[in-house]
Each structure stands twice: as C-alpha cells, then as structure tokens.
Amino acid sequence: MEAEESRAQPPGPGSAGWDLGDTARLRHFLCFGCEGSAYRVKEHKLGFDSAEALLRMIEEGRGCEVVEEIKAFSQEGRAARQEPLLFALAVCSQCSDAKTKQAAFKAVPEVCCIPTHLFTFIQFKKDLKEGMKCGMWGRALRKAVADWYNGKNGMTLALAVTKYKQRSGWSHKDLLRLSHLKPASEGIAIVTKYITKGWKDVQEAYKEKAVSAETEKLLKYLEAVEKVKCTKDELEVIHLIEEYGLVREHLLTNHLKSKEVWKALLKEMPISVLLRNLGKLTANSVLEPRGSEVAIVCEKLRNEKLLKKGRIHPFHILVALETYKVGHGNRGKLWWRPDEDILEALDASFYKAFKTLEPTRKRFVVAVDVSASMTQKVLGSVLSASTVAAVMCMVVARTEKDSQIVAFSHEMVPCPVTADMTLPQVLVKMYEIPVGTTDCSLPMIWAQKTQTAADVFIVFTDNETFAGNTPPAVALTEYREKMGIPAKLVVCGMTSHNFTIAGPDDRGML
C-alpha cells in the first residue's frame, strides 16, 4: 500500500483530487464493504454492484494481485468486517482465470481463520452460483475445504468444531460430506468421525486400541464435550470446565443459570468476552462486592499483556465502562448495581489500553467540533459524540509524536490536549473553547496558512457542517499542491445517517 501511494503523482492544477484507481477502490471494499469514499456503519448486502473494481481487476488479469490484497487485509487485521474479504475471495474462486482461482482456493485456510469464516465463504459461493447450471463443489473447492481441516492438528480442530458448530445454514457435517475429506492424521480422523458418526462410534473404534498421549488427550476432550451435554450435576459441569477448558458454547442453557458455573468460566474467559458480560455477571451475583471473582476480573482488566493479546482498543474499554456504569442493558431487561472496584479497574484499563496502540508515524491534524450538539449519542453507542472525539484526540496525542489538535471556533484554534491528560480533562478543555461553525475546509486552509505539514486531516463532528466559500475537496487539493504533500482527509459524522463530504473519486478522502 505504501509503495503504491509513494509512486502516485500529485494532481495537476484544477483537478478534482487524487484519482481513486481500482487498487484503491478494492482496498476500500475490503476494508469497508464499499468502493467509494463514504463508509456507513449499517451493514448492507454485498453483491457485484458494490465490487466493480474487483471484477475489473480480475478481467484485466490482476486476479492474483486481488488475492494477495485479501490475504494481507486478513492477516494484518485491516478490515472493519470480515464479510467483504470472504465475498471477494469467493468471487476470485469462481472467476474464469485459472491462476486466480488457484490462488483463491490456496488462500482459504489463511483467510478463513475460524469455522464461521469458512461457512460464510461457502455461503457466498452458493449465492454467487444462483442461476448457474454448473455445481459449485468441484475438485478445487473440495481440496480447499479438505486442506482447511487437514491443516490443523487434532486438538486444535476439536476445539474449533465443538465451539463453532454451524453458521449461514452450513455445518461441519455438510462440509465433510461434500468435500470427501481424507484425514491426514489420526487426530483429524478422530474429529471427522466424531462429526459424521458421533461420539459412540469414536468410543467403539478406540476402546481397545493402544493410542499415543496426544490421541488420549483428544479423546478425553471429546468425551468431556459429550458428558457436559448430558449432565445436570453442577459440580460435574464445573469440573469439566476446569479440567478440559470447556467454554460457554459447549454448555446447555440450563448450565448458564448457575452462578458457580459462570465463576468457573470466568477464570479463563478472554478479556473481550468479559467486557461484554460484566453487567450480566454482576446482575446474576457472580460478581459480588469484595468477592474473589471481582478480584479476578480486576486483575484481568489491569493486565497490559492481556489487553495487547486481545487487541483491546481504549474504545472497547470505554464502551464497557459507560455501559456498566449505567447499571442496565439497552433494552432495560437486565439491571445491576455497578461494583466500585470494577469501575476503578475499567478506568485504569482504559488508560493502559493506549499503551498497546501502534503509532502510524504520520503527521496528523485533528479538528474537533465543540458545539453543544456534540453531546448527542453516537449512532448505536452509549458514548456521546464529544466523548468519542475526545478519545480520538487522546489516541493521537499519546501515539503520534507529530500531531496538532485544533477546534472550530471563530477560527481554527489550538485544542491543548497532551499525552498525560485524562478523559475528563480533555473534555473540560474542549468545553472551554468558544463555539464556531464547522466548516470542514478550515483545517486545510489553516494548515496551509500556518505552513503545518500534515499527512492526515481528521474532522470529528456530529451532523452539522457549515458550507463555506471553499469546498473541503478543493481546500484539500490546494493544500496538496502548495505543500507538496499527498495529504488525506477523513470526515467523521458521528450522529449522521446520510453524510457525504468526501469526493467520491478521491482515494485520499473518506
């Protein structure tokens, strides 16, 4: 990505902006699910009409390049959603170019990290085949699916298939039947027999066989998965969780009514799952004041290694904190009294999470709307627009050494956010600034006037933008020409349903 952008030439005088070529459009699609410069949070159905650049690149013989982009986005975690990657891979796997198809099928195990991804990929292929006379289960797909299963060891596969059983109308049994899989190892053979024939057949086949320690461990694990489905004994469920690492997806609904079962799950619960369930765990009295479980939760939340491993962003923590602080769920069905120790741990965790962020080493100018309307809630969130803007200012101030933070007042004025400030302190500084109109062209005009070098301009507003004499796209183009910097502009309308400022054909605007 860097190489291509560094080769790009600045637009000539009078041009509308940086051309949004097919590679850039493809990257937009892989990241956001749409090719243009407007990204909307609401999900929409993916189809050929939203992936025209992808189709053009395949037609031009650049299909293998597309597959490499898909792999890069998947492996580096650059996509906002996984579905566009899986859709694009499905399209590549069904095109007429043999090399592209081969590359796409070979990439399936790399892009489909968990069974859910594999099921979604298969469903996209089925959708793309609608109206076509030929079947989709040719030799190449059968091999790709077989390689997905055979590429794992027995224990890893057992964990995956018992946790993610089915999705998008597909199950593991379906895929094994249609792929004609030949197990590459004894472990895979055991798991596939378990899926297709059931535990009793596995038990019968191995009851008198001498097996390795690894196979013994696998058989014990599958036995535990089966046992937990049949038992009503709370102590046995807890033992199976602790002994074999069973997770919530392995348990029956009735098991999850038990406080003690939740306490057992809590010990090895990933931090991302914990953040989503704090309210429920408190409401069900699993987390009680000064209890040992509260201590476990607080220790996890303050653990920087766990935050980094779980790729937890400060926003994840803040949303969990604000949701937990309110004391009830979105629909009001679940109520709880927030635990003070957990609130303190969440607050500490919020600031620790900034340390896990990687700097981009770009030069940023962040411009913030400080009007009263920024107190509105962001669409689908518990956070206000001003809080989101403040956190993003903190992210930039703490991770990017070369950054400027400004606010829309009577003119662009400095917003004094420093790396050591807390969120309340940042919000106070924002509230102290006299309100001005939110003209999205002003950051570029200000930067050009003050000779401020910037690679990225980001504007945070709610829904209100004032159209001044110079459109933002023109101001950005003029800045690029005068400063000789291929700068980009991102305008984030946080309470808007239909917000379009970015030039539709400028790959440097979003």
Language model segments and positions:
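Long lumenal/extracellular ectodomains of secretory and single-pass membrane proteins
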Residues: 1-383, 401-510
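Metal-dependent nuclease catalytic cores in nucleic-acid-processing enzymes
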Residues: 387-404
